[in-house]
Amino acid sequence: MSFPIDSIKIKVESHFLAQQSSLLEGKYVFSYTVTIVNLSDINVTLKSRHWIITDANGAESQVKGPGVVGETPTIAPNNAYQYTSGTVFETPVGFMHGRYTMESGLGETFEASIPSFRLAMPGVMQ
C-alpha cells in the first residue's frame, strides 16, 4: 500500500520585512510561514527540504538540507506543523517553490510538493 501523497497539504504565507530591508543596497528581506497538514491516518516525518528560489531578474538558487529550522518534525494524523523562516532577494519580488522529502510511519519515503508562492514588497507589480 502506498502513502496517499494528496493527504499532505502545504500552505505558505509571505511577508515583506521593511525594517530589515535596505532598498538602496538592493536587500529585500522576507519571512514566510509554512503550514504542513497531515490529513492521513498515519504519522509522517519531514526528513529534508529542497527549495528553488528565483528573483525578478530570473536568478535562481537552490537550498537543500535536512529538516526545517533545525527540526525533523513528525506530524500526527489530522494535525499540522507550522514554522517560519526567511530569505533575502536583490529584487523587490521573487518566487519560491520546492519539495519536502517525507517518511510515513510505515517507512515509505515520498515527496510532497511545495506550491510556488510570491514574495513581494507591497506596492510592487511584477
Swiss-Prot record:
Choose any GO biological process term that the UniProt entry carries and state it: error-free translesion synthesis
Q: Pfam families, alphabetically?
A: DUF525
- Which superkingdom is the protein from? Bacteria
What the entry lists under SUPFAM superfamilies is as follows: ApaG-like
The ApaG domain covers which part of the protein?
2-126
- PANTHER family of this UniProt entry? F-BOX ONLY PROTEIN 3, POLYMERASE DELTA-INTERACTING PROTEIN 2
Per its record, how is this protein called by name?
A: Protein ApaG
- Biological source species: Shewanella denitrificans (strain OS217 / ATCC BAA-1090 / DSM 15013)
